[in-house]
């Protein structure tokens, strides 16, 4: 058998290929890191006072002041709300959403958020866009009292179209072992309180985007339900972070037995996660003041009330199950932190469903 002579492989270009020519700009990444360092410093708290740039983030648990701590961890993303941020070219609030989705899941277990890490993946890194995103993450961390101790920025040409990106967040908190939630003494007659949401928060945006498409409106159009704002601005209203008011109420009273973060799946999927067998949450739908954005979505998309309740928060972003004799005390503690609290219903016996409704939702 004869071997065909082939010319040796030659590098493309006089000096060969570079990583930048392959689509990864290390210099842009380094520039972004330098720009975000002041943002990261603004989130420092007891236990975390280091700089980013090392191989791992450090946290001194002893400095946080816990006696018998249990660590609680959560991770989450922002979902297709990011597509609105990308299409509307507004990136400074989705970082708040990212933090909120993680730390709200910590506080429902009675945990104080300690530190946060983010993952930012994009097809083509824009340092200015990245700084806007991290500015939102830092703001969310400040609202939660959590330190931003590290993260990863991944520029991946070919994985994402230029301009597209995705975010993931990772949060770790701690609770004293004897203050973990939910408690085991939830009982018939316990009162259900609701804390107001700021709007759609970070769930249901595939349906939101479909409804907007059917409406014929664009992200720069005036929001029909929020005068003075564009549709993109209104729908990008960041998710509320409930950490500080809830921790204040937990510390001020022993009345809170359980908390539920109302995210994807709405009331019927999230409330039963914290309830014992044999008990259901009876919710008076007429007690909910439904924000205008949900009425617009329901009417424009022809979405039925039950579908709204299993997709969106419908105006209630957090649920608390409270001892009846401690309701006034808990409400006062929450109100002192600026929370709008509504009495939604009570715990009742059940055979099957974990949530039962009274009345109708005012859409």
UniProtKB/Swiss-Prot annotation:
Its main location: cytoplasm. Pathway: Purine metabolism; IMP biosynthesis via de novo pathway; 5-amino-1-(5-phospho-D-ribosyl)imidazole from N(2)-formyl-N(1)-(5-phospho-D-ribosyl)glycinamide: step 2/2. GO terms for cellular component: cytosol. One of its GO terms (biological process) is adenine biosynthetic process. It holds the Pfam family AIRS. Its EC number is 6.3.3.1. SUPFAM superfamilies: PurM C-terminal domain-like, PurM N-terminal domain-like. It catalyses: 2-formamido-N(1)-(5-O-phospho-beta-D-ribosyl)acetamidine + ATP = 5-amino-1-(5-phospho-beta-D-ribosyl)imidazole + ADP + phosphate + H(+). GO terms for molecular function: ATP binding; phosphoribosylamine-glycine ligase activity; phosphoribosylformylglycinamidine cyclo-ligase activity. It is found in: Cytoplasm. Keywords: ATP-binding, Cytoplasm, Ligase, Nucleotide-binding, Purine biosynthesis. HAMAP family: AIRS (MF_00741). This is Phosphoribosylformylglycinamidine cyclo-ligase. It comes from Brucella anthropi (strain ATCC 49188 / DSM 6882 / CCUG 24695 / JCM 21032 / LMG 3331 / NBRC 15819 / NCTC 12168 / Alc 37) (Ochrobactrum anthropi).
């Amino acid at each position: 058998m004869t071997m065909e002579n082939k010319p040796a492989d030659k590098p493309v270009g006089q000096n060969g290929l570079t990583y930048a020519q392959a689509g990864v700009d290390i210099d842009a990444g380094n520039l972004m890191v330098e720009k975000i360092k002041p943002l990261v410093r603004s989130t420092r708290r007891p236990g975390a006072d280091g700089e980013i740039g090392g191989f791992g983030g450090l946290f001194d648990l002893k400095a946080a002041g816990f006696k018998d701590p249990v660590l609680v961890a959560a991770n989450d993303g922002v979902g297709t709300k990011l597509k609105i941020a990308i299409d509307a070219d507004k990136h400074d609030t989705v970082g708040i959403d990212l933090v909120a989705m993680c730390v709200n899941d910590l506080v429902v277990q009675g945990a104080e958020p300690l530190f946060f890490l983010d993952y930012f993946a994009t097809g083509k890194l824009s340092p200015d866009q990245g700084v806007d995103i991290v500015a939102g993450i830092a703001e969310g961390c400040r609202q939660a009292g959590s330190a931003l101790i590290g993260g990863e920025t991944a520029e991946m040409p070919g994985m994402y179209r230029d301009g597209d990106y995705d975010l993931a967040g990772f949060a770790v908190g701690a609770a004293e072992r004897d203050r973990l939630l939910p408690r085991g003494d939830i009982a018939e007659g316990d009162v259900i309180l609701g804390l107001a949401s700021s709007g759609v928060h970070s769930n249901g945006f595939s349906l939101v985007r479909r409804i907007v498409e059917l409406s014929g409106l664009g992200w720069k159009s005036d929001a029909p339900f929020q005068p003075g704002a564009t549709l993109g601005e209104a729908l990008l209203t960041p998710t509320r972070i409930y950490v500080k008011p809830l921790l204040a109420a937990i510390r001020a009273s022993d009345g809170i037995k359980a908390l539920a973060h109302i995210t994807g799946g709405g009331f019927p999927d999230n409330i039963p996660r914290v309830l014992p067998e044999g008990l259901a949450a009876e919710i008076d739908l007429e007690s909910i003041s439904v924000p205008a954005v949900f009425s617009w979505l329901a009417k424009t998309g022809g979405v039925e009330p039950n579908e709204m309740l299993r997709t969106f928060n419908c105006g209630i972003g957090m649920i608390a199950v409270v001892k009846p004799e401690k309701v006034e005390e808990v409400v006062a503690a929450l109100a002192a932190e600026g929370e709008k609290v509504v009495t939604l219903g009570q715990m009742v016996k059940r055979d099957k469903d974990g949530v039962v409704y009274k009345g109708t939702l005012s859409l």
